[in-house]
């Protein structure tokens, strides 16, 4: 593993592992060579170093004879711990005063405040898991839906890493053969069969292309789908949002232009989080405030991953709808066209809009067609590929490394077509191995590790 220790890992770190604030319990975690001695110095009822691993002990925390709290101490002896070091977790009462006093006491006894993500960094540096798995720990902690939880869990257990590792192993074999040729350059010996190498690279590219393509779904599973509801004033946008959310989030009024700014909330559909933005209506504004809302609506449209265009079937003509659809087609984001208020004009729909395909008809007020709309939301983000248990890329860093790997592999193919010397071919293969190694941490730098783990919460 090409990495340098970014912090002194011979010391013992401590941090609050439970959320800040008052709670039933607070959990303080220590990791490092002095974790047992430091704990024993404030927990006199047990010699922590002498107890078996994975055991739990009840007793008092004492500071020079003064009892601070009655606690539960859990002992994990390295390497059978999260960090593969000696680890102690102290569960105390969740008073902010007790937690603060206990942390200060442990610091005085020789522990050091942990940096954000330092426990997980130590686990990575000690070989507990690779870098992609370490990043999945943070994703698991921040997961807020069934889908994001499932993807993070699969990655933390090594599913994604296994795919990358297999690709590297296949390439390493051919790289070694090409490198060996350089030692026999004067004899014109070819150890790496070029036909087999070309076949392998095409196979690897197919896997990488699938992983790159999966990022569009993986990213929205991890971060949610920014979804904008647009349409003319009084088309029923706020009513639709309220119906989807089953609560009154937006002001509903018969007065056109009531929604002057943005109302944001989240809807979970089969584990996928859609971050809905109900916008001001698209029309000529009658005052300065409303004009600002319309302008920002158009800005939100360009930033959205999904657009729901809602129109009133009662007051919209086919010509108007076709004109609006032309504007929607200019957007990069996929969109759904939804006709609202079918309860008021159901019989005339077929005649009026018979030449326009793909319209989803609903009544937001009567809750008609809402389930069909939800299924269309899932279909448009290609949700089926997630349900098939395919590996998904959710991390932008991994996505960029995969793209760079693909570029390097294209260079290898170009080099073989041009019959470049073996040393240049080997260089391009090494470059592809480098970018794959960036994902798992087989190739890493201090700056990269600092950047990744600094985004973790303290105590993890």
Swiss-Prot record:
Gene that this sequence comes from: mnmE
Binding residues annotated for Mg(2+), in chain numbering: 238, 259
Protein task: Exhibits a very high intrinsic GTPase hydrolysis rate. Involved in the addition of a carboxymethylaminomethyl (cmnm) group at the wobble position (U34) of certain tRNAs, forming tRNA-cmnm(5)s(2)U34.
Keywords per UniProt: Cytoplasm, GTP-binding, Hydrolase, Magnesium, Metal-binding, Nucleotide-binding, Potassium, tRNA processing
Record-given protein name: tRNA modification GTPase MnmE
Organism: Cytophaga hutchinsonii (strain ATCC 33406 / DSM 1761 / CIP 103989 / NBRC 15051 / NCIMB 9469 / D465)
Subcellular location: Cytoplasm
Binding-site positions, (6S)-5-formyl-5,6,7,8-tetrahydrofolate: 29, 89, 128, 460
Subunit structure: Homodimer. Heterotetramer of two MnmE and two MnmG subunits.
Family, as annotated: Belongs to the TRAFAC class TrmE-Era-EngA-EngB-Septin-like GTPase superfamily. TrmE GTPase family.
Top-level EC class as recorded in UniProt: hydrolase
One Pfam family matching this protein: MnmE_helical
NCBIfam families according to UniProt: mnmE_trmE_thdF (TIGR00450), PRK05291.1-3 (NF003661), small_GTP (TIGR00231)
Residues holding GTP: 234-239, 253-259, 278-281
């Amino acid at each position: 593993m090409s990495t340098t220790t970014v912090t002194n890992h011979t010391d013992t770190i401590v941090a609050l592992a439970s959320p800040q604030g008052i709670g039933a319990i607070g959990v303080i975690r220590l990791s490092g060579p002095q974790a047992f001695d430091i704990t024993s110095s404030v927990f006199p009822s047990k010699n922590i170093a002498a107890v078996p691993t994975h055991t739990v002990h009840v007793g008092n925390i004492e500071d020079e004879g003064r009892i601070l709290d009655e606690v539960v101490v859990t002992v994990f002896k390295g390497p059978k711990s999260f960090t593969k070091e000696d680890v102690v977790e102290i569960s105390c009462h969740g008073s902010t005063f007790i937690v603060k006093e206990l942390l200060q006491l442990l610091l005085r006894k020789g522990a050091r405040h942990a940096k954000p993500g330092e426990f997980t960094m130590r686990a990575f540096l000690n070989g507990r898991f690779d870098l992609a798995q370490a990043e999945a720990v943070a994703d698991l902690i921040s997961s807020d839906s069934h889908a994001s939880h499932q993807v993070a869990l699969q990655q933390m257990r090594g599913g994604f890493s296994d795919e990358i590792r297999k690709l590297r192993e296949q390439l390493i074999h051919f790289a070694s053969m090409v490198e060996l040729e350089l030692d026999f350059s004067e004899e014109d010996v070819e150890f790496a069969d070029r036909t087999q190498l070309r076949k392998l690279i095409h196979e690897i590219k197919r896997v990488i292309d699938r992983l790159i393509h999966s990022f569009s779904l993986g990213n929205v599973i991890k971060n949610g789908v920014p979804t904008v509801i647009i349409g003319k004033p009084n088309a029923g946008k706020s009513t639709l949002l309220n119906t989807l959310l089953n609560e009154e989030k937006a002001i509903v009024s018969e007065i056109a232009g009531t929604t002057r700014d943005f109302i944001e909330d989240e809807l979970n559909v089969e584990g996928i989080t859609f971050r809905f933005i109900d916008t001001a209506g698209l029309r000529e504004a009658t005052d300065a405030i409303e004009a600002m809302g319309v302008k920002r609506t158009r800005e939100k449209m360009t930033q959205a991953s999904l657009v729901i265009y809602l129109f009133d079937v009662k007051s919209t003509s086919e010509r108007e709808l076709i004109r609006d659809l032309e504007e929607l087609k200019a957007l990069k984001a996929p969109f759904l066209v939804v006709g609202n208020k079918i309860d008021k004009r159901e019989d005339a729909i077929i005649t009026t809009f018979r030449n326009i395909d793909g319209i989803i008809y609903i009544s937001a007020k009567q809750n008609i067609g809402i389930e069909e709309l939800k299924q269309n939301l899932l279909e448009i983000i290609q949700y089926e590929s997630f349900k098939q248990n395919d590996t998904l890329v959710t991390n932008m860093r991994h996505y960029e490394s995969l793209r760079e790997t693909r570029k390097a592999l294209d260079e290898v193919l170009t080099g073989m077509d041009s019959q470049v010397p073996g040393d240049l071919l080997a260089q391009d293969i090494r470059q592809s191995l480098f970018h794959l190694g960036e994902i798992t941490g087989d190739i890493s730098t201090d700056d990269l590790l600092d950047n990744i783990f600094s985004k973790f919460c303290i105590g993890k």
